[in-house]
From Swiss-Prot:
NCBIfam families named in the record: lexA
Family: Belongs to the peptidase S24 family.
Protein name: LexA repressor
Keywords: Autocatalytic cleavage, DNA damage, DNA repair, DNA replication, DNA-binding, Hydrolase, Repressor, SOS response, Transcription, Transcription regulation
HAMAP family noted in UniProt: LexA
Pfam families according to UniProt: LexA_DNA_bind (PF01726), Peptidase_S24 (PF00717)
The species this protein was found in: Cupriavidus metallidurans (strain ATCC 43123 / DSM 2839 / NBRC 102507 / CH34) (Ralstonia metallidurans)
Keyword Transcription on entry: yes
DNA-binding region location: 28-48
Active-site residue numbers: S136, K173
Amino acid sequence: MATLTPRQQQIFDLIRDTIRNTGFPPTRAEIAAEFGFSSPNSAEEHLRALARKGVIELTPGASRGIRLKVTRSDSERPDQFSLPMPGVLQLTLPLVGRVAAGSPILAAEHIDRQYQVDASVFDERPDYLLRVRGLSMRDAGILDGDLLAVKKASEAANGKVVVARLGDDVTVKRLKKRGDTIELIAENPDFQNIVLHAGRDEFSLEGIAVGLIRSSGF
């Protein structure tokens, strides 16, 4: 395992803890603010150093495109989802592919397969995995083909990444609520945000994102 400088260890720990608490890594700007760096470019330099040492992987062009490749903690708790490991408690979760218009997201015809993941990586237990379609959440590190771990919920706090149903469509976006206005925010400037009005637009929450499995190998 690579030896990290004290500052690199602090940044690694911040990334790990942010993933545990929110399901997603911090942005460069958030890292810079946490450590008092003059700009996000300083955070980028530290991230590249961590990547060179092989402890993280960076996704080009994504502000939250940071993936942990190793665990550095006393408990050696995995921070990323992985294939099943012998002797580790596994969760069996349904993997949802394309969702047909007007039908429940966990309807049998939507289940591509059952998938096993290490239970210890979740602070909140997910109910299912959803295969992501498209790049509207690219800058949150959520890419086309990735598997989003989702906990069923009908309410969510501002800033959470959610699975929402809009009429007959299901989408993954970041939630922002202001009074009766609901905004579903894309994490990619090539996509428009969706603005809705409670009581007037057909909208419901299907769940909250609690983690991510990168698509490579699936």
